[in-house]
Amino acid sequence: MILQQPLERGPPSRDPRATTGVTRGLNASLSPREPLHKQFLSEENMATHFSRLSLHNDHPYCSPPVTFPEALPPLRSPCPELLLWRYPGSLIPEALRLLRLGDTPSPYYPASPAGDIVEL
């Protein structure tokens, strides 16, 4: 069984609706202090719940999506240049060794002269 709302601890209080004769209906709004009843989870209840779900995006289960402003402006003319990159994890111990020796490390990829552009 699942509790819908935690029960309050403390001295018992009288329900003001008990003296006025108001009964709790299915659509009546509940006060935040009033504990809710336990729900019995049966196979039929679960089958009913899952049969109402949909795999398609035609049922709004939550609020409408929020659109955020673009983080970057859209590219006006995309560039077809290729960037070669290697994970530097294996180069870190070598760089530390060279720093201890006082040497300047040579770049792994030699710099290409300006004007050499690789296009796809």
Swiss-Prot record:
Residues 20-30 have a biased composition (Polar residues). A motif (Nuclear export signal) lies at residues 92-101. Its main location: cytoplasm. Residues 58-61 are annotated as: Interaction with HCFC1. InterPro entries: HCFC1R1. One of its GO terms (cellular component) is nucleoplasm. It comes from the Eukaryota. Interacts with HCFC1. This is Host cell factor C1 regulator 1. It comes from Mus musculus (Mouse). The gene is Hcfc1r1.
